[in-house]
Amino acid sequence: MESPQIRVAMLCGNGRSSRILYNSLATLPGVHITRVIVENSPSALALLRGRVRKLGTARVAGQLLFMAYNRLLSRASAQRIQQLMKGYGISDAPFPTANLHQVDSINNPGTIGLLAAARPDAVIVNGTRIIAASILSAIACPVINTHMGITPRYRGVHGGYWALARGDRENCGVTVHLVDPGIDTGGVLYQDTIHPDSRDNFNTYPIHQLAKAIPLIMAALDDVRRQQIQVRPGVLPSMLWSHPTLFEYLGNRIRHGAK
């Protein structure tokens, strides 16, 4: 007997990773994406002010220097990214307009109504700000996130990079986990590792991670379909990571080859 189709809604940003996930899930048999809710990018100034409050001016200045450098690195990585995407058979084509809704913030009260109308069996999250507890509590089905790192050791951003930067290659990977109000603190469903080579860098690690994540998401959706979700232990200790500063990046590249 054929498995029943699972209804999926997505809460995501409009970045490459979200588009890759959409295009990969949309082609899977037994998956019906009923709605895609895309969050507009937050104000750069608001993000900057928030970082300064949390991290201090000096660290944020170092991060901005790295981000400027990474623009150049990103351009130099374009060919490798396309090569990897072709090899993995994944696409970052734009979202189709059918069932696409844009919101200023995923935490707008209107998000609840959009999700309720979509009647999902599961909600897949990618590339959004932290989802408010008021939104999560109003969602009646499992909410599942793809995190670019092994949790809870590499919560926050650029988890794969930070594992390599610390010489922790066996924990350079990706996690599919349930979403709670914390920062990547939800229960782990599935994890897997990646093995980048000398051609890879800060901008190509996520392509490897996304390719590994897709079968993990499918496994999680199968668990939802069967009502057999099982939380697994993650990798400790729990640590929260942010963007590297330029000097951290250069030091990590020299010490551990993390590019």
Across the structure, where does each feature detected by a protein language model lie?
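One-carbon transfer enzymes
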Residues: 1-259
